[in-house]
Amino acid sequence: KRFMSNLPAFADLKTRVAGEATQGWVRGLDGRRLTIRSEHAALNTVLQSAGAIVMKQALILLDKYAKLWKLDYKIVGNIHDEVQSEVKTKDAEKFGRLAVSCLEAAGLHFKLNCPLAGEYKIGTTWSETH
């Protein structure tokens, strides 16, 4: 109870999602219908899908601007909130800064109440960049 009283917006979200869940689906961040497995899983479905939707928007922007700027890159993996890319050394810093900017822009696109932030790392192995 104390947790919820300290986070009134979260408590409101939980109540709203629980109400929607009775119909077997909830609305995602972008308005799409998300079928839920159970009412118990509804809040998790909303939160997990929001992360995926924001990340997809960030990747759309990243691809658009990286092509526009003629950067030499390939996106090789998207794992939850992380993107792994192969980028020519000459473009690595610019691509990294662009990726962070695109994540921030994705949050603005969906009018999130808290700003999104990100970071990038440059390396030759996954271990160095994770």
Name the predicted role of every residue range.
Residues 1-130:
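Conserved catalytic core of nucleotide polymerization and phosphodiester-bond processing enzymes
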